[in-house]
């Protein structure tokens, strides 16, 4: 059985997953997707929260809602990738072997790197 591992269950990772699942034979492929967060944040919707058009509930959903049946979803941080041995080591010590690897980990918000960003309006206004 061939093993596909996708790192990152954000927009890119789940789009790849949902495009590949219908075309890969489940008898021949084992698919695992890994993400450190259980929640998906629909970031374009953040713009509309301060104007009352969306609420947090509208833009924050469980990532499991976007994972097709039969796919193994692991909620864990990634420790390292050994590309020569085709292994992904997770923070909890789990090792995932793969034949194919898709890296779609996206970006992380680091507000403290921008002076003034962590002020009193952080996560209460458009900066959320």
Spans of features found by a protein language model:
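FAD-binding core/adjacent interface of flavoenzyme oxidoreductases
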Residues: 71-128
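Beta1-alpha1 glycine-rich phosphate/pyrophosphate-binding loop at the start
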Residues: 1-72
């Amino acid at each position: 059985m061939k093993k596909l591992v996708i790192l990152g269950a954000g927009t890119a990772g789940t789009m790849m997953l949902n495009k590949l699942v219908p075309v890969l034979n489940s008898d021949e492929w084992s698919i695992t997707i890994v993400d450190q967060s259980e929640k998906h944040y629909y970031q374009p919707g953040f713009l509309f929260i301060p104007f009352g058009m969306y609420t947090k509930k509208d833009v924050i959903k469980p990532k499991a809602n976007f994972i097709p049946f039969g796919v193994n979803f692991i909620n864990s941080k990634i420790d390292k990738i050994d590309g020569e041995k085709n292994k992904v080591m997770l923070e909890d010590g789990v090792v995932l072997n793969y034949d194919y690897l898709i890296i779609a980990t996206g970006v992380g918000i680091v507000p403290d790197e921008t002076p003034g960003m962590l002020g009193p309006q952080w996560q209460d206004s458009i900066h959320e």
